[in-house]
Structures are given as structure tokens and as C-alpha cells.
């Protein structure tokens, strides 16, 4: 794993299919993420490969929206998407384990994203990449804990 990718896991006391239904409902992401405030399906879509959704983010210093495309929708196993046509890949993998499901959230900057950040932020691109990387590394454990609480009814 490089500095531009990160994943973390938690065991959730629910079966993979039920947990998949929860994490593939992007409209709930604003409940769990410390940075994403809301998501919605574009054009009335849903969690299927090729479907787009928009996310509204706020890091306390700035607000922005992203457009994402679902790239994996395998019920009970994996749900993943890419942001801005491949700049960053986010996803959840689910694996049955004793006591429920191991839920892993992953994040990875893609080569297109590095290039895109340099085009968008110019001389501030590297600083922005560090900021986004830190946000992912700090936010993923928080998001996983919140999903676990929701899924387990807490």
C-alpha cells in the first residue's frame, strides 16, 4: 500500500447482504462520514455499475461537490465507485466472519487524480493531495464506526 491509498476494517454484527444494502445506499453517507454532508443518485439511479451520484462535501474550510460513478456493485461482497471519472477510487468490501461481516473501506488516489489535481490546483496540488490523504486516513475509521453503530441498531 502506498501513501496514496488506505483501508481499514471493522467487524459488524450483521450478515453481508444486510450490510451491503446499507453501504450501497449512498444517500446515507452523510450520516456517517465526517466530511461528506450528503449524496444523491443522479437521474434517479441506484447502486448499479455505471450509475452516477453526486456528493456534497465540507471540510470546515471549503465546500465542494463531486460526481462519482459506481464501478463495482456485487451484493454482499463489494460496492465501489470512482470520483471525477477516475481521480480517486473509494469502496467497501464485505467478508463473512464469525460474529458477522468484516467491512473494509478503501480509498486510493489514481494517476488521473494526481494529474487532475495538478491541473486544478497548480502549485498547490501537492498540498491539496496531502490534505485529502489525511482526510481519508482520519475519516475512514470514523465512517466505519458510524456504519457499525447504525447497522447494529445503536
What are these regions (language model features)?
Residues 51-58, 78-85:
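Short beta-strand segments that buttress and anchor functional surface loops
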Residues 82-138, 142, 147:
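Beta-strand/loop substructures that line and gate deep hydrophobic ligand-binding cavities in soluble
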Residues 18-23, 29, 53, 70, ...:
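Hydrophobic pocket/interface hotspot
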Residues 41, 142-154:
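Short, highly charged C-terminal tails/helix-capping segments
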Residues 1-43:
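Hydrophobic ligand-binding cavity/cleft-lining segments
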Residues 16-17, 46-47, 71-76, 93-102, ...:
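A short, structured loop/turn motif at beta-sheet edges
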Residues 1-11, 134-141, 153-154:
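Hydrophobic-ligand-binding modules of eukaryotic lipid transfer/binding families
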Residues 5-7, 63-67, 87-91:
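Short, surface-exposed coil-to-beta transition loops
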Amino acid at each position: 500500500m502506498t501513501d496514496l491509498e488506505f483501508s481499514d476494517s471493522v467487524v459488524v454484527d450483521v450478515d453481508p447482504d444486510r450490510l451491503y444494502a446499507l453501504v450501497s445506499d449512498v444517500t446515507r453517507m452523510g450520516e456517517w462520514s465526517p466530511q461528506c454532508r450528503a449524496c444523491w443518485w443522479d437521474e434517479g439511479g441506484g447502486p448499479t455499475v455505471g450509475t452516477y451520484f453526486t456528493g456534497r462535501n465540507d471540510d470546515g474550510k471549503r465546500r465542494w461537490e463531486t460526481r462519482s460513478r459506481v464501478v463495482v456493485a456485487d451484493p454482499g461482497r463489494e460496492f465501489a465507485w470512482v470520483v471525477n471519472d477516475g481521480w480517486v477510487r473509494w469502496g467497501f468490501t464485505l467478508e463473512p466472519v464469525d460474529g458477522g461481516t468484516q467491512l473494509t473501506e478503501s480509498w486510493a488516489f489514481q494517476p488521473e487524480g494526481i494529474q487532475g489535481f495538478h491541473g486544478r490546483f497548480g502549485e498547490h496540488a501537492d498540498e491539496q493531495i496531502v490534505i485529502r490523504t489525511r482526510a481519508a486516513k482520519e475519516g475512514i475509521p470514523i465512517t466505519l464506526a458510524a456504519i457499525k453503530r447504525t447497522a447494529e441498531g445503536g
